[in-house]
From Swiss-Prot:
The keyword Transport applies. When transfected in S.cerevisiae, it can complement the absence of yeast of ARV1 protein, suggesting a conserved role in sphingolipid metabolism. The gene is ARV1. This is Protein ARV1. It is found in: Endoplasmic reticulum membrane. The keyword S-adenosyl-L-methionine does not apply.
Amino acid sequence: MGNGGRSGLQQGKGNVDGVAATPTAASASCQYRCIECNQEAKELYRDYNHGVLKITICKSCQKPVDKYIEYDPVIILINAILCKAQAYRHILFNTQINIHGKLCIFCLLCEAYLRWWQLQDSNQNTAPDDLIRYAKEWDFYRMFAIAALEQTAYFIGIFTFLWVERPMTAKKKPNFILLLKALLLSSYGKLLLIPAVIWEHDYTSVCLKLIKVFVLTSNFQAIRVTLNINRKLSFLAVLSGLLLESIMVYFFQSMEWDVGSDYAIFKSQDF
């Protein structure tokens, strides 16, 4: 999530005017957001001649609009891991990151691999090698489809709640496309599933639960920052998504489909 932390400063150089606004600021009068107070801003910095740069001060809170444009991407990533609202605003509003789809696919592959690994670990097959190889490959595709359906149900639950509560979620019409991108980006914690599987130990199941909690916390912060809503509504939105996802898991298990994961918080025996 931390890529592009210095892109604003790098792109602004090379303008020949006396004072140059930030990139594309002319085409979008209020493209950016102050990371402190969430107020809209026309630019992040001004580029004077001879490479003299000055960070824009927010007119509302009198603080720098985005201090992170001077930070190293690693620092931004650490702040994002700590779920700081300022880091989330920088990433979501003041940078151009187009890896949402790729990150989503990769996270689903990680989750599918975890489920597939647990499924193979619990099954003992005596069939011929070719048949076993084909069955294992099919199981991986099935785990990927189940993980995708569960994530879709989770997102639908969140969007449904926010749509019902939209008069309370924002003063203006909420940008659900931006929210979807924010949810996909904030699910990056699922990448930790692979190390948890590779370095297997007695506490792997606990680690998987902690990863799940971390992803949910990141989603919670992404919803709160994107829509500028209070913690209660953001928490209820995540809870609604979890509820619909749990119903989907229960449906799969009632159909006697092994979802093959300890990663899910709710299982059939919980109902």
